[in-house]
Amino acid sequence: ARGGEVGVFRRDAGRAGGWAREGGFLVQGGVADCAWAPREAGTVLATAGPGGELSFWGPSGADGEWASVAPPLEVAPCGGGSLRCVRFAPASQGLATAVAGEDGCIAVCRADGFRADATWRVEGRFQAMPGSAAVSLAWRPYGGEGVPPMLLVGTTKGAAVWMFDAVLGKWTAAGSVPLTAEACVEDVDWAPAVGRACETVAIAVSNWALILRVAGDPGALNIEKCAEFEHPAAVHQVEWNLSGTTLASTAGDGVARLWKENALGEWGEVAHVIGQ
């Protein structure tokens, strides 16, 4: 997105793996972040505006242009200010999003039904870390009956895991990420727990990509660092593959790196791509 204009691209198998613009749309007031809905909801993109507006978009016809598929939702943060990040929950938890605000407030929004054109509402809010901006979000990638929804929240002063307590009807802190000092967490991601006894998350902070294990009861999580990778420049993004076995990181030096655990449980770089 640039200047409120959002472009949608699709990989073209006939052009040696190149990408071609498929369509786009213009968001009045600009775009702070965007996110794809789960496939079960169809082809839907959510945009978070700096003015506090959450909008939902989809293809409108054969001409490739997109249009709004639901009335915009005003997601005014707890103390006002702009939105920074939006992420959809896994499909097992229904059609829901979490939106992070400049004031550190997280708003959880839900649709009445599993269609993006349904009516959306703000279901709940919580303050992630007082005195800091919330800049990145990652949902626990699975859920359902007996598994409480969880969110990993990165802020300008650190990161923590939050859990929805169905008994209390609100979000509560479930565990904090151990950092040596207050630091801005640029990005976070929660790995799918495929064949693992514990869950794994990753965060980007300063020149480092950190991998942490999450274990314990939902109400008292134990979060421990198990690997750290120093980069020659600030790390901007971290993302797991679909099986949660390989981590990708991008940094300010224009290089994307892949990290993987070997048979001895040791993590290391296995490949890198230099941007052009």
Residue ranges: model-predicted function:
Residues 176-187, 221-242, 273-276:
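Conserved blade-ending motifs and adjacent loop-strand segments that build the rim/top face
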Residues 29-38, 78-90, 130-143, 182-193, ...:
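Canonical WD40 repeat/beta-propeller blade segments in eukaryotic WD-repeat proteins
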Residues 26-30, 44:
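Helix-rich alpha-solenoid scaffolding regions
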Residues 1, 45-49, 97-101, 151-155, ...:
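Conserved beta-strand element within WD40/beta-propeller blades
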Residues 24-26, 74-78, 126-129, 177-180, ...:
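Surface loop/turn motifs at the tips and blade-to-blade linkers of beta-strand repeat domains
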Residues 233-260:
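C-terminal, well-structured subdomains that either form a transmembrane helix-short loop-helix hairpin
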Residues 8-21, 40-42, 51-73, 91-94, ...:
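Per-blade loop-tip surfaces of WD-repeat and WD-like beta-propellers in eukaryotic adaptors/scaffolds
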Residues 172-176, 183-192, 200-202:
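A beta-strand-loop signature enriched in Asp, Gly, Thr, and Trp
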